[in-house]
Amino acid sequence: DRYWREVFDPVAEECGLEKTAPTDQRYFNDDYIAVFDKTEDAMERLLEEDTPENRVRAYCHYHLGVESVLAQTGYYGLSSAFSESGSDEIALGDWPNSQGLVNGISKIRSDEGRHVGFGMSKVRGYVQNGDVDESVVQDVLQDLMPHIAGTVSDFQENINPVPLVNYARDKLTRRIEIITDEDAEIPEVDELVKLDEESSAAAD
């Protein structure tokens, strides 16, 4: 809230725009709400019945669906729009260069990378030990993917959503491969959160 009050609100006022709250419903479409409703349901199910499969479902919803695929796609889109990095196909028209904003986002990515790595490690352990079938992971993430695509596609102008959807789909596929492939290894945190333009390992 503080960042919103001290950064967004003054700019909105100066530009003659309506000041809104960061939790204003207009910012959350039906697909975004569905992602978090399903995540909440998975957490509630775990509280009711703490089993390996329910743990994996919870990890897949939060650590992989939300904090990994959805968040990473958002960071990629912001970096593409507000800096020289990312994809030239996403931002249409003129966008301000806000490298400071992108640098700040990179700090958030680093923090969330630890969460993603933790979740992937837990899920991979259950799958590779034979406690949970890999189909559970695939089912959860494939169920979330249309909602993730719907979230990152919800732009009325100046954004081409196709590269974002492709990025999210590729990221989800790579996460599943790392978890289900016996010979795969979970990347280090710094590699895990790199965006595509930063390293060839960004698909990890």
Residue ranges and their predicted role:
Residues 1-204:
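Non-heme di-metal
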